[in-house]
Amino acid sequence: MKKFFLIAVVLLMMINFIINYHHEVTKEKHTPMADFKTKVEMAPMKEYNDPDFGYVVKYPCFFQQEDTSVSGCQGYARFSFTNHANIILESYVTPNYSNTLQACADSLAQKLHSERTIQASNKAFILSGPVYENGVRVDGYSHYDKFIKSGRILFVYSLTYPDSYKPAMPRLFKLIDDWKVLGAY
């Protein structure tokens, strides 16, 4: 009887350990960032067609398209995810005052405090780095932007995200890397 009781106690302790261990492992996997990563990797993409400049951007279907009509800016669109984190995709058109692509990239890298410049092609480049607002670093946020030069204008597709969510961003980085504007090349 003592052996049975001892075996039962040991068995119950093992079962309790397994249940608690499984609960902790499962809890770690279901962080908001991990949930976002799964969601963004599986999400179908929607398309936004800009009525003013004709460019197209894709964005995850669970992002909300914001009303940008009050901004007064032509060629501007904004898509956001604000559940546990603020993740913003923006597309816009801006004047290009530089004569060369490199001069344009250097000027914008300095203005945006970007840490690196990647030339995506002979008409496009990517800037990334910490986010600054009015010259002050926005703690914990970074940007990843693609600029496509077309004559005297730049088409821009931009991602702003929390640094803690960077492991969940590869699909959005690729979305921006692969973005093209018809007629700009």
Where are these regions (language model features)?
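Conserved polar/disulfide-associated segments of primarily extracytoplasmic proteins
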Residues: 66-174, 185
